[in-house]
């Protein structure tokens, strides 16, 4: 509630504050008019509870004014309520937008480790339910809880003043019993709702995971397995939902028994008053109307309290996401990264591991010279891609420091650091949108001509133009509607459009055929020579990086060799072993193809 008050009463928006005050004014006015309705009804009954034929007169003269006042009060109460809804709706929707935007922005700023450990389906579900919970909380507070409390207070005061302590005592006992029963039962039901929420998140996560990996499901004929996983999650949700529904029936029954008992007692007391001559028939009608008038807000209060507890649970999850600490933080007033040397990168005794018991880099020290093409090679798991994640500050090293042109990357702003680095990852992330938007994502302000030029330089323009919808072709979720090679060339196009001073290629051509790879690498090399960009190529296929100015060989998180291709081959070390193993593999594959293609001799 404290968190929500900042959004409901924003410091910087006098317009929203005025709307809240106007909504409160309409609320009070509407409830005052609503409470007047039973009084006018009593006057109408008492006015007509005489022998009109004997006394003379008409409906207009006997009860006309009261009937008009009765109708006007009902209309006024309804109009006030609807105006209140209309006035407050903009406040509620703005608050929801602010919370959702802030949470979404916070999630985008969290470190990579958080997103790798969380499942997307569960996060989106939590945000969706949380924003709905906020909407319900705001509307229930303004439209149900506060109006109900005001109406109950007014009715209790009227019953006490008009009819004495007995009616007041019954009313007070009813309110206490109703409220206590509702709170106790709802608290008991909360654990069932929590279980249902957890099962709902699990089912959503399983569904999203299976649909995203649709091809893998098909490749291994595991449809039944995935359906079984989903059904198992839904079965848990089913069991929890049955408990929720059963406990709700118990709650509703108890509330109705309490209220009906109170109404019966009050009607008995009213009837006794009529027999004793202290009350009129109109008074009995007034008591009945006032008590029934309480039934609607009380029923609302019961249902609102139930939903309010659920909404608070959902909001708790949402606000807890906002409270997740940023492990990667920039210093206050951090300076922007500048590159006076052109982008020299230096790792100084860097140690890092994704898990404490599994170190990846061990006191690694290496310098990547500015304006040079540098390759990083080595066996799988030696830490090649980890260098990029540390440089990009997706993670911070456990020890050691990383410098760019003698500036510790922890001392510069994250925005300037990440704007200076361009990446072509091995698994290209694409949005479910057009080809043009996915290329333009490298520079959202780029003109169409620059987008086309970037595509040409990445050797993908002609291919795109051959598609029926050209640059407006949708690539599908995660780019599933285009080939792996096309995805990689789109990623290169995006990088060329961004045009950063530091370039990282993580197996950027692994999905390309030899001819396309050679043409693309030729264009990339032209870009590097034109602007003397510092570039780092992570590669397994050594033939793609043999022309690098410097080749860094990693093993078990340390630099074991460093030099040009010729120098490393002369050194006869790990690089030579890797090169010879790949050459032998290519020779065997070529020999195998030749044997398969050789003509069978005719006997």
Swiss-Prot record:
CDD domains: ABC_6TM_ATM1_ABCB7 (cd18582), ABCC_ATM1_transporter (cd03253)
Superkingdom of source: Eukaryota
GO cellular component terms given for this protein: mitochondrial inner membrane
Residue positions binding ATP: 354, 378-389
Domain ABC transporter span(s) in chain numbering: 345-581
Lipid bilayer topology: Multi-pass membrane protein
Principal cellular location given in the protein's record: mitochondrion
InterPro entries in UniProt: AAA+_ATPase, ABC1_TM_dom, ABC1_TM_sf, ABC_transporter-like_ATP-bd, ABC_transporter-like_CS, P-loop_NTPase, Type_1_exporter
Any Pfam family matching the protein: ABC_tran
Transmembrane domains' residue ranges: 20-41, 65-88, 138-161, 163-183, 250-268, 284-305
Statement: the UniProt record of this protein carries the keyword Secreted: no
Residue intervals of the ABC transmembrane type-1 domain: 20-310
Keywords for the protein's UniProt record, in alphabetical order: ATP-binding, Membrane, Mitochondrion, Mitochondrion inner membrane, Nucleotide-binding, Transit peptide, Translocase, Transmembrane, Transmembrane helix, Transport
GO biological process, one term: intracellular iron ion homeostasis
Mitochondrial matrix side: 89-137, 184-249, 306-603
Keyword Glycoprotein: no
EC numbers, comma separated: 7.-.-.-
Enzyme class: translocase
Mitochondrial intermembrane-facing ranges: 42-64, 162, 269-283
Localisation per UniProt entry: Mitochondrion inner membrane
UniProt similarity note: Belongs to the ABC transporter superfamily. ABCB family. Heavy Metal importer (TC 3.A.1.210) subfamily.
Job description of the protein: Performs an essential function in the generation of cytoplasmic iron-sulfur proteins by mediating the ATP-dependent export of Fe/S cluster precursors synthesized by NFS1 and other mitochondrial proteins. Hydrolyzes ATP. Binds glutathione and may function by transporting a glutathione-conjugated iron-sulfur compound.
Name this protein carries in UniProt: Iron-sulfur clusters transporter ATM1, mitochondrial
Lineage of origin: Eukaryota, Fungi, Dikarya, Ascomycota, Pezizomycotina
Protein's gene: ATM1
């Amino acid at each position: 509630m404290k968190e929500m008050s900042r959004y409901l009463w924003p410091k910087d928006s006098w317009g929203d504050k005025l709307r809240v005050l106007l909504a409160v004014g309409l609320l009070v006015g509407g409830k005052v008019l609503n409470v007047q309705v039973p009084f006018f009804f009593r006057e109408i009954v008492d006015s007509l509870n005489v022998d009109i034929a004997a006394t003379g007169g008409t409906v207009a003269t006997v009860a006309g004014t009261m009937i008009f006042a009765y109708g006007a009060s009902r209309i006024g109460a309804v109009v006030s309520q609807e105006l209140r809804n209309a006035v407050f709706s903009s406040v509620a929707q703005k608050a929801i937008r602010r919370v959702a935007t802030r949470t979404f922005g916070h999630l985008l700023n969290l470190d990579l480790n958080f997103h790798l450990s969380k499942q997307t389906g569960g996060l989106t579900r939590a945000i969706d339910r949380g924003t709905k919970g906020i909407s319900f909380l705001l509307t229930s507070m303004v439209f149900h809880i506060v109006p109900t409390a005001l109406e109950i207070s007014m009715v209790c005061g009227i019953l006490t003043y008009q009819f004495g302590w007995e009616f007041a005592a019954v009313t007070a006992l009813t309110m206490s019993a109703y409220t206590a029963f509702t709170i106790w039962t709802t608290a008991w039901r909360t654990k069932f709702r929590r279980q249902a929420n957890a099962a709902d998140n699990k089912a959503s996560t399983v569904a999203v995971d299976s649909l995203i990996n649709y091809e893998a499901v098909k490749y291994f004929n595991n449809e039944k397995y995935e359906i079984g996983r989903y059904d198992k999650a839904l079965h848990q949700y089913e069991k929890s939902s049955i408990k929720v529904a059963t406990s709700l029936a118990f709650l509703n029954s108890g509330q109705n028994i309490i209220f009906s008992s109170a109404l019966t007692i009050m009607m008995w007391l009213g009837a006794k008053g009529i027999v004793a001559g202290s009350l009129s028939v109109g008074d009995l009608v007034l008591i009945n109307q006032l008590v029934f008038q309480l039934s609607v807000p009380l029923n609302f209060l019961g249902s609102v309290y139930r939903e309010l507890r659920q909404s608070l649970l959902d909001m708790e999850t949402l606000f807890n996401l906002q409270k997740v600490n940023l492990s990667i933080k920039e210093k206050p007033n951090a300076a922007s990264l500048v590159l006076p040397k052109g982008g020299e990168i230096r790792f100084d005794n860097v140690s890092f591991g994704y898990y404490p018991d599994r170190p990846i880099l061990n006191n690694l020290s290496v310098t990547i010279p500015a304006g040079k093409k540098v390759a990083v090679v080595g066996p799988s798991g030696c830490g090649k891609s980890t260098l990029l994640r540390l440089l990009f500050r997706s993670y911070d090293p456990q020890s050691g420091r990383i410098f760019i042109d003698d500036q510790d990357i922890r001392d510069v702003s994250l925005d300037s650091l990440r704007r200076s680095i361009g990446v072509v990852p091995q698994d290209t992330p694409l949005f479910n949108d057009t080809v043009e938007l996915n290329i333009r994502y490298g520079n959202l302000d780029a003109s169409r001509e620059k987008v086309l030029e970037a595509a040409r330089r990445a050797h993908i323009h002609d291919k795109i133009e051959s598609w029926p919808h050209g640059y407006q072709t949708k690539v599908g979720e995660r780019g599933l509607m285009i080939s792996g090679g096309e995805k990689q060339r789109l990623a290169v196009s995006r990088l060329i459009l961004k045009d950063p001073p530091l370039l990282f290629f993580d197996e950027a051509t692994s999905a390309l055929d030899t001819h396309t790879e050679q043409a693309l690498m030729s264009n990339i090399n032209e870009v590097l020579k034109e602007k003397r960009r510092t570039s780092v190529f992570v590669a397994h296929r050594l033939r793609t990086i043999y022309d690098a100015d410097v080749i860094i060989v990693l093993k078990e998180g340390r630099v074991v060799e460093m030099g040009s291709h010729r120098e490393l081959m002369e050194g006869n070390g790990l690089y030579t072993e890797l090169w010879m193993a790949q050459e032998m593999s290519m020779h065997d594959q070529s020999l195998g193809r030749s044997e398969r293609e050789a003509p069978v001799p005719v006997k």
